Amino acid sequence: MRRIIGFVTMFFLAVTVVFGKSQENVIDITFNKLGAVYHKNESGNAVCKVIKANNDITYEVVVEIVDIDKKPIGYKKTYTLSSPFERYYYVPFQFSELGYYYLSVSFLHGDKVIFSKQEGFGVIPDVTLTKKDYDSPFGVGAHYARYGDWRVAEIQQALGIAWVRDVARWKDFIGTARNTPDPFIDYLDRHNICWLPILDYVDANHGWRDENGIWRWDEDVTNIKKYVEMNENRILVYESQNEPSNFAGWNKRWPHPQGQKWRPQGWGVPFTDLVKQMHDSIKAVNGDIKLIWPGEEEWIEYFDDNREDVANHIDFTAIHPYILWRKYPETSPFYDGFYKIQKEMLKKRNIPTEIWVTETGWTTYLPDSIRRHFPPVTEYQQAQYLVRNYLVQLYFGAGKMFWYELVEEPFGVHHPESGFGILRYNTMLTVKPAAVAFANMVNNYRYLKPIGKYLAKDRKTYGFIYENEKESGAPVLSIWREADEKEELIPVKYTKSLTEIGRAHV
């Protein structure tokens, strides 16, 4: 792939290769900094613990740092040891180049690698959030409470990701007399992170039908209103519910006639009644608070066609554009006119045309014999697609985007949900290449405004032209190939801008 300004997509993961018995070989690599993410010229270090249990065999232990191309960068130490042994090696480092690197430790007997382990770490620009950036389009989905590790906000802050989409646990406050905000808000405030709260699921089975044929959730809606009152001056946008087609019993109580649970014919009418009631109760607290409706496929049309006064209850909508088996961001319908068509539909129905992407992502799970909805990608591809997807969707009409998700989940290496995260689910929450790519994207694109699409001669070359909202100067061009490499001849009017336009990262 041509490596052009503006996006840094890095390489491979920490990989363990075992040829002997795992219980006889121990390699632990621990970085001195949470997330294993460092700034340029920042001093860092790691401690490598190595244990070999076999007796009377001599090994070479090789400790080395390599770059994203697996090329040595100058640090390599070799130790000759007779087993059994337990050693600790201190590895200092400092880098002036942005990138994704990994520290490798190997046991060798003769010329044969008996056991090895690699752990990745990142060097990023200083994009640390020093204040809340509500205007930033860059967000990430997360399950902070599920992780059970509240250090994770420190890493998000360092990566410069301004927004987090996470559950608002209004049910936890039922029956309390609390008149202060949800403590999660204070926690995020300390890290200058903006919160998009998804109101926790309303159980479909709680609904009942009144004499006018309207489905009601009075108790749940009242409790949601109390929760919003707690946070009145701290949160001004909520997401109503997450994927009613999949959760909270909606498609079970009101199934689609042909079993197509994603489609709203069945659960759509009672769900519309619920969200309208949620909207009214929230507006009663503060008319400036916005409530996002889920807007997948024909959902909005169905809601609006089958219930009265729906348009007046929609502040704006959200979508979850996963690419599924069409692998590349540019081969999705979102590159070919979706936003234009969707916004024309919304405008025709007098519904605000703002659209947020509240979930999108690619997963690095390991495929098995079961065919799943999501195509597995390498960590290198995940990093590439993250940046390309943000650039594509933000250009064509997304207001904000939230990558799914921040941390990998412990569901097993063959489960797609385990691989969406950009941080590893380990004791140090170490960065994957996609996290480094995200930080570089924030650094390069936060204040770039798209002003045009690059018209390439080859259909598999893509790009956009930007102007900087904060600095005057010539436009910035960002281009890339779908999957391969190819030279592109670019006419440039201002040759003095070539240094900036042509600077290659990855």
Language-model segment annotations:
Residues 140, 144-173, 183-187, 193-196:
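Catalytic domains of carbohydrate-active enzymes, especially glycoside hydrolases
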Residues 136-142, 164-166, 195-199, 236-240, ...:
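Hydrophobic faces of well-ordered beta-strands that scaffold small-molecule active sites
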Residues 454-499:
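Carbohydrate-binding surface patches
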Residues 501-506:
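Conserved small/polar residues in nucleotide/adenosyl-binding loops
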Residues 362-439, 454-459:
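Aromatic/acidic polysaccharide-binding cleft in carbohydrate-active enzymes
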